[in-house]
UniProtKB/Swiss-Prot annotation:
GO terms for molecular function: calcium ion binding; cholesterol-protein transferase activity; patched binding; peptidase activity. Gene3D superfamilies: 3.30.1380.10, Hedgehog/Intein (Hint) domain. It holds the Pfam family Hint. It comes from Homo sapiens (Human). This is Indian hedgehog protein. Ca(2+) 1 binds at E94, E95, D100, T130, E131. It is an enzyme of class 3 (hydrolase). PANTHER family: HEDGEHOG, INDIAN HEDGEHOG PROTEIN.
């Protein structure tokens, strides 16, 4: 059957998807999606004094990126800065010029998100900004304060015992680099608005290997739709699953990856920060009860699932770091999971609920089953996940998404 004749069926599937997703999203108002399991809140680990996250220099691709030049009020780039009048944030503004309120939109979005987290964590306490955009040259050369991409923050009560946890909340709010720099403040910064790494989506490096049903191990760059790769079934057991399409395929793009290293057995997996990985807080959890977690939220001491002998087994996370590599590949399998570098991962990214994502992709799986063929994967982000991402932004809570969003989504 030709793709042209199948198009009406696909449109019907999308309409049916909307009918399914809208009641689930709106039926309980601002609360969680109907049918989703309530998970206990994840324990937040405060940053130690002088610790920074991610554990790379601030002006590298894996963090906030390079310095792009000072912005003055008279410069063309001044229009990139926007004032922040959020009443839930206190701005010190010691210059009395309003400069501390000026920042890039990305910085503003992260700061507003952090302000909510601060009020939830400490009722009656607000976020306080001591330094924002700097036009007077008070910071070191090539400081991101000169571009409106950095802020120094405290809590309104100036309780220094809170600053380690404040730094962790800033990481969770999506700042691209957070540094517990001083006993007097926490430093946070973001990527530039037009940075190529500003949105990461969910991918693996080109050289990451998967296992085929034949037993051969191949790089993701060599995988094609129709291949059967090792994955995890709904019951937590290993299975081989058909590769349907590539949700993202960008062979020539540099990406910043989160590197998860385990011990007993040793494994090393690189994936983008917004990608979902299955984790548990102890090794006694059955595989089917491991929860989907953003890669950027995985911490040493947690457990991930790895391919062992026999079946799948937990492995303790020993270290987490960042790495920049060329190429980005995100295959979608029939089961919505795959085993990459012998570590079990979800096929999905950007949205926190793996099961909701798997449900949302059933029209694509149906279309694939009706139009089986030897398709050559194109480059870039597939249109369907972009559509779902935009739809989800309208229907789901902000907390349902990773702060870095999805590459090419235009959000």
């Amino acid at each position: 059957m030709s793709p042209a004749r199948l198009r009406p069926r696909l449109h019907f599937c999308l309409v049916l998807l909307l009918l399914l997703v809208v009641p689930a999203a709106w039926g309980c108002g601002p609360g969680r999606v109907v049918g989703s399991r309530r998970r206990p809140p994840r324990k937040l680990v405060p940053l130690a004094y002088k610790q920074f996250s991610p554990n790379v220099p601030e002006k590298t691709l894996g963090a906030s990126g390079r310095y792009e030049g000072k912005i003055a009020r008279s410069s063309e780039r001044f229009k990139e800065l926007t004032p922040n009048y959020n009443p839930d944030i206190i701005f010190k503004d010691e210059e009395n010029t309003g400069a501390d309120r000026l920042m890039t939109q990305r910085c503003k979005d992260r700061l507003n998100s952090l302000a909510i987290s601060v009020m939830n964590q400490w009722p009656g306490v607000k976020l306080r900004v001591t330094e924002g955009w700097d036009e007077d040259g008070h910071h070191s050369e090539e400081s991101l304060h000169y571009e409106g991409r950095a802020v120094d923050i405290t809590t309104s009560d100036r309780d220094r015992n809170k600053y380690g946890l404040l730094a962790r909340l800033a990481v969770e709010a999506g700042f691209d680099w957070v540094y517990y720099e001083s006993k007097a403040h926490v430093h946070c910064s973001v990527k530039s608005e037009h940075s190529a790494a500003a949105k990461t989506g969910g991918c693996f490096p080109a050289g990451a290997q998967v296992r085929l049903e034949s037993g051969a191990r191949v790089a993701l760059s060599a995988v094609r739709p129709g291949d059967r790769v090792l994955a995890m079934g709904e019951d937590g057991s290993p299975t081989f699953s058909d590769v349907l399409i590539f949700l993202d395929r960008e062979p020539h793009r540099l990406r910043a990856f989160q590197v998860i290293e385990t011990q007993d057995p040793p494994r090393r997996l690189a994936l983008t920060p917004a990608h979902l990985l299955f984790t548990a807080d102890n090794h006694t959890e059955p595989a089917a009860r491991f929860r989907a977690t953003f890669a950027s939220h995985v911490q040493p001491g947690q457990y991930v699932l790895v391919a062992g002998v026999p079946g799948l087994q937990p492995a303790r996370v020993a270290a987490v770091s960042t790495h920049v590599a060329l190429g980005a590949y995100a295959p979608l399998t029939k089961h919505g999971t795959l085993v990459v570098e012998d570590v079990v991962a979800s096929c999905f990214a950007a949205v926190a609920d793996h099961h909701l994502a798997q449900l949302a992709f059933w029209p694509l799986r149906l279309f694939h089953s009706l139009a089986w063929g030897s398709w050559t994967p194109g480059e870039g982000v597939h249109w369907y996940p972009q559509l779902l991402y935009r739809l989800g932004r309208l229907l789901l809570e902000e907390g349902s998404f990773h702060p870095l969003g999805m590459s090419g989504a235009g959000s």
